[in-house]
Swiss-Prot record:
Residues 15-137 form the MsrB domain. It comes from Xylella fastidiosa (strain 9a5c). The lineage of its organism: Bacteria, Pseudomonadati, Pseudomonadota, Gammaproteobacteria, Lysobacterales. This is Peptide methionine sulfoxide reductase MsrB. GO terms for molecular function: peptide-methionine (R)-S-oxide reductase activity; zinc ion binding. Zn(2+) binds at residues 54, 57, 103, 106.
Length: 155
């Protein structure tokens, strides 16, 4: 279900409160554009039905029906929950030219987008598990910013 969510960034005080909830690895990946090691992340082999939300702000990012096994060692999806929830940015770090993907609401680093996915989009959204929280189908979506916009929707 694609519904409208408030994409206003967290206020400075909300952002500081959210930063305080991160462990060192989450901070490195979400806020410093890091990457977790392949094949040893918690959501790679998750096959449950549900929604993957931003670990930092709770915005729905991907649905399990768009997840596929890419063989790369990171959770991969062929399309986002809605394109409005993903921001794309040109990335030339580490001597490569790539498209970085970030949460459209809080600007947290999620991973990268590659043009080698399956039909129908032929895109591969390659994500860090650390950047995501999995919400099983039938569970209320998180409302980390206390705006009341997520709590009416179940995955």
């Amino acid at each position: 279900m694609n519904v409208a969510f408030d994409l206003t960034p967290p206020s400075p005080s909300q952002r500081e409160a959210l930063i305080a909830t991160l462990n060192a690895e989450e901070h490195r990946i979400l806020l410093q554009h890091g990457t977790e090691a392949p094949f040893c992340n918690r959501l790679l082999d998750n096959n449950q039905l549900g929604t993957y939300t931003c670990r930092f702000c709770g915005l729905p990012l991907f649905h399990s029906n768009a997840k596929f096994k890419s063989g790369t060692g990171w959770p991969s999806f062929f399309e986002p929950y809605t394109h409005a929830h993903i921001r794309k940015q040109h990335d030339t770090s580490h001597g490569m030219i790539r498209t970085e993907i970030l949460c459209a609401r809080c600007n947290s680093h999620l991973g990268h987008l590659f043009p080698d996915g399956p039909p129908p989009t032929y895109e591969r959204y390659c994500l860090n598990s650390v950047s995501l929280t999995f919400i099983p189908t039938g569970t209320l979506l998180p409302d980390q910013l206390h705006r009341g916009d997520n709590t009416a929707y179940r995955t």
